[in-house]
A protein has these predicted regions:
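Short, low-complexity, Lys/Arg-enriched N-terminal segments of secretory-pathway carbohydrate enzymes
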Residues: 1-10
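Alpha/propeptide regions of enzymes that mature by internal proteolysis
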Residues: 12-357
Length: 357
């Protein structure tokens, strides 16, 4: 005989089981919703990129909308979009492409990366000289070699072998900047103490205690795109930090830092003080957080909060988009907030979105 108490317990057990089944059903639905949302809900294609470089957004969007150049449509969007900044550095704060961010020797060098979400293929160039469309060379590294990153003069050699033109990246603008910087005692710089270099001796009293990172010194175009087929690509192009020590490679060509994307989840890209930010693999981390179901905005905010715990003065920003077409961004130590660009098929034109505290 089953006592009243026992029956009561059975009811509770059954109710609990039922509850678990219902909860399981809903969490499975939520899971399926996260990973299999139909394309028509997403307003694809979609592209986001850092800063106000809205023509790059438009070019990326139009490239995808018109069906791309190759079958990797989102990647074509990334390449053509970033190419726009590389060809028009004056419209991209001189932080991408030629004619900007000279190093201690007055040279402009380029960093770039692309990633294809369906296969996780990556190609990148670092500290590349004398070739303008760096992101296109990065794509060649990905598609024509088994390597991931080529750097320096040999990246240039590779680019020339691939048919790219060799050109000066310095201009009268960078030459003038460099002269002024030398005349002002080579401040700021990235050394931690007095040092001798080929440029001469720098004494303690001539040093900037902290290098100045900010809007104009240190940024990048970082871009994430999802094409009509739901494929995700991401990429970055940058001319690095102004007055960098020759040889310095920034975060832009470092996969997981400059950008990262997974077809099942979405993608993220970053901009800012790359020397510090690359220590956290922020773009990869944001994508992994989104994979766990986190909204892109919250993922970016958590990542920025973590960096600030270790480097309270680090300046920069992260943008992200998930497979549902939800976007998010977060920034740190940018006094005027952080602008980024968005275009999707629900919008007549690209828009600049500025986040501020
Ligand atoms: C975008 O490109 C057009 C020319 O195609 C140019 O007139 C305009 O100034 C550019 N806008 C920005 C914000 O760079
Ligand atoms: C760029 O720098 C190189 C090496 O210093 C120099 O030969 C060249 O004339 C410069 N080009 C421009 C446009 O200033
Ligand atoms: C730099 O070189 C000078 C001699 O030219 C030497 O006295 C000094 O110790 C050197 N400083 C450093 C930091 O190496
Ligand atoms: C951050 O900047 C403040 C103000 O310039 C300075 O006092 C502080 O030492 C800096 N902190 C670090 C960790 O660099």
């Amino acid at each position: 005989m089953i006592g009243r108490e026992q029956q009561g317990k059975n009811v509770i057990v059954r109710a609990t089981l039922l509850l678990f089944i219902i909860m399981g059903f809903f969490s499975m639905m939520a899971y399926l919703h996260t990973y299999n949302t139909p394309a028509q809900l997403l307003h694809l294609p979609i592209v986001i990129n850092t800063w106000t470089f809205i023509n790059a957004t438009r070019v990326a969007y139009r490239t995808m909308q018109s069906g791309g150049v190759t079958e990797r449509i989102a990647l074509d969007g990334i390449e053509k979009g970033c190419n726009w900044c590389e060809a028009h550095p004056d419209h991209c704060d001189f932080t991408v492409g030629y004619g900007g961010s000279p190093n201690e020797w007055g040279q402009t060098t380029l960093d770039a990366m692309v990633m294809w979400g369906p296969t996780r293929e990556v190609g990148a160039v670092g500290y590349m000289k004398r070739v303008k469309p760096a992101i296109s060379v990065a794509r060649k590294v990905m598609e024509r070699t088994y390597h991931t990153i080529l750097v320096g003069d040999e990246a240039t050699t590779f680019a020339v072998e691939m048919g790219f033109e060799e050109e000066d990246l310095n201009t009268t603008r960078t030459a003038e900047m460099w002269r002024e910087w030398k005349a002002a005692g080579r401040k700021p710089n990235f050394w931690k103490g007095p040092h001798n270099s080929t440029q001469g001796v720098t004494k303690r009293k001539e040093m900037n205690e902290k290098p100045e990172f900010g809007r104009w010194n240190h940024d990048t175009i970082g871009m994430v795109a999802i094409d009509q087929q739901g494929n995700v690509a991401c990429g970055v192009s940058s001319n690095g930090a102004t007055w960098k020590i020759p040889g310095r490679v920034g975060d832009a060509p470092i996969v997981g830092s400059g950008a990262y994307c997974e077809n099942e989840v979405g993608g993220a890209a970053e901009t800012g003080d790359g020397d510090v930010m690359m220590r956290f693999s922020p773009s990869n981390r944001v994508v992994q957080m989104m994979k766990g179901g986190m909204h892109p905005k919250e993922a970016c905010e958590r990542m920025v909060a973590e960096i600030l715990r270790y480097y309270p003065n680090c300046s920069g920003a992260i943008i992200a988009v998930n497979k549902q077409g939800q976007i998010g961004a977060a920034y740190m130590n940018l006094p005027n907030g952080f602008p980024f660009c968005l275009q999707n098929s629900n919008m007549k034109d690209a828009a600049i979105i500025t986040i501020k505290d």
